[in-house]
UniProtKB/Swiss-Prot annotation:
Substrate binds at H129, R159, D160, R191, R197, R267, A268, D269, R270, K341. This is 2,3-bisphosphoglycerate-independent phosphoglycerate mutase. Coiled coil: none annotated. One of its GO terms (cellular component) is cytosol. The gene is gpmI. Mn(2+) 2 binds at D18, S68, D449, H450. CDD domains: iPGM (cd16010). Its EC number is 5.4.2.12. It comes from Coxiella burnetii (strain Dugway 5J108-111). Monomer. Binds 2 manganese ions per subunit.
Length: 519
């Protein structure tokens, strides 16, 4: 059937199950272990296929696991988008990184004033928010520029990496500092505090006070000893308490007037809150007892339009994304998600566009205020489904995009039982959504942005698996009689497929392909 013959269903709902990968493994697979009558029925009775969601298929290096930002960019973009990880690694390999104007200008200011350069960043090989080789490249660049005081304030991962795996990265960068003789790791803190994105400002405040005042629950003479101290307290990397690294008779190293700060996270969403604390003149989220007057603050990528900082790698602009294309044709669309994934169905799905397009409404369902989501694995899925069912029945939108955060956010805790419960909640929600859609003649495409919940234990490290995976993800069509092509697709094929089902040609900017044929 061609687009011309295709009757536009209303509404079309794109359901993104965040962190829902496909694996034949049944052991430690929370998806396979869960009781999922709705998903079982969908896979039995409706056309479905599998999609690549990692590596080169989503603009990342070979073997690099996907993530929510990359996944939504490709789902909404309908094309391969070179990712910041790949761009920056390529710049390091070519030498362009060491000539980057924003970095060079900031480092020269520090040198001229004989001030310190403070590097903030997730010290991790994970490649989701940062990569430790890029931090090492900046240390090398600062050394080349003749900076005498280079301080790394290391945020620790344990979420996109095994829970206790920071030591290798710490040892590598410590060896580099020893070789240069002009810097050190000045502090440690878990990403739980320094990289909150859900307005839990008390966590951000702890990170800010550590950086600006040296306020720390723990002190240690070396970063390795600080990490071991955290492990003794029962903390994994993600939850390392603020720890200042200095000898007993020395004062903490802090960010002071005239210093230069470079934030080396390339993913924006979890870097924003801490950046606002430094740069926002009208900041009110907590009381900044100290606010250093910096010579420069550089972000590796652009974090937000209202963050006024030098940017080392400005974003690539995407035109005619799914949202923009539908908006230009007068289609009404809704984006709905809970707090943890709201930016993904709005900003990232729109290719980095902050403001909604004409005809695009947005609905934010607050995520529950709990320390970790294994404590409330249902999160806000039921509340979101209640609203979604009501909206479907009102028949106001041509396209609705929703994201269920549970498989990813609960999967990140490493709690297999809680993740299984999360999957079962999602299954119940899907039943209600599909029932509502079928009552009004609507249709659904169900997919995921990357894997996670299908692997809850790592046999190699003998630790809970808290990171994403490189597994394929499903694509299920709930609607008219149709057949998917036999070849495995990729996330950039979702938008062209969706447009075909809505009776529209894809724009020329979309290089992804339609994967389905209506009978």
């Amino acid at each position: 059937m061609t687009q011309a013959d295709n009757q536009n269903p209303k509404p079309m709902v794109l359901i993104i199950l965040d962190g829902f990968g496909e694996s034949d493994e049944t052991t430690h697979n929370a998806i396979k272990e869960a009781n999922t009558p709705t998903l079982d029925k969908l896979f039995r009775h409706y056309p479905h296929t599998l999609l690549e969601a990692s590596g080169r298929a989503v603009g990342l290096p070979d073997g690099q696991m996907g993530n929510s930002e990359v996944g939504h960019l490709h789902i909404g973009g309908g094309r391969k988008v070179p990712q910041d990880l790949t761009r920056i690694d390529a710049a390091i390999a070519s030498g362009e990184f060491y000539e980057n104007p924003a970095l060079i200008e900031a480092l020269e200011k520090a040198k001229a004033l004989n001030k310190a350069v403070h590097i903030l960043g997730l010290l991790s090989p994970g490649g989701v928010h940062s990569r430790d080789n890029q931090i090492a490249a900046l240390v090398e660049l600062a050394h080349r520029c003749g900076i005498k005081k280079i301080y790394l304030h290391a945020i620790l991962d344990g979420r996109d990496t095994p829970p206790k795996s920071a030591l290798l990265s710490i040892e590598k960068i410590t060896d580099q500092f020893h070789a240069y003789g002009n810097g050190k790791i000045a502090s440690l803190i878990g990403r739980y505090y320094a990289m909150d994105r859900d307005k839990r400002w008390d966590r951000t405040e702890k990170a800010y006070d550590l950086l600006t005042q040296g306020t720390a629950q723990f002190h240690a003479p070396t970063a390795k000893e600080g990490l071991m101290l955290a492990y003794e307290q029962g903390n994994t990397d993600e939850f390392v308490s603020p720890t200042s690294i200095h000898r007993h008779n020395e004062t903490p190293i802090t960010i002071e007037d005239g210093d230069v700060v470079v934030f080396m996270n390339f993913r924006a969403d979890r870097a924003r809150q801490l950046t606002y604390a430094f740069l926002d003149d009208h900041f009110t989220a907590f009381n900044r007892q100290v606010r250093p007057k910096l010579s420069a603050f550089v972000t590796l990528t652009a974090y937000a339009k209202d963050i006024h900082a030098a940017v080392a790698f400005p974003p690539l602009e995407l035109h005619n994304t799914l949202g923009e294309y539908l908006s230009a044709r007068g289609y009404r669309q809704l984006r709905i998600a809970e707090t943890e994934k709201y930016a993904h169905v709005t900003y990232f799905l729109n290719g980095g566009q902050e403001a909604p397009f004409n005809g695009e409404d947005r609905l934010l369902i607050p995520s529950p205020k709990v320390a970790t989501y294994d404590l409330q694995p249902e999160m806000s899925a039921v509340e979101m489904t209640n609203k979604l069912v009501e909206i479907i029945q009102n028949d106001d939108y041509d396209l609705i995009v929703c994201n269920f955060a549970n498989p990813d956010m609960v999967g990140h805790t490493g709690d297999e039982t809680a993740t299984r419960e999360a999957i079962q909640v999602i299954d119940d929600c899907l039943k209600r959504i599909i029932t509502a859609l079928q009552s009004v003649g609507g249709e659904a495409l169900i997919t995921a942005d990357h894997g996670n919940a299908e692997k809850m234990f790592d046999e190699k490290t003998n630790q809970p698996h808290t990171a994403h995976t490189s597994n394929l993800v499903p694509l299920i069509y709930v609607g008219r009689e149709a057949q998917f092509c036999k070849e495995v697709g990729a996330l950039d094929d979702v938008a062209p497929t969706l447009l075909y089902l809505m009776g529209l040609e894809k724009p020329r900017e979309m290089t992804g392909r339609n994967l389905i044929t209506l009978k």
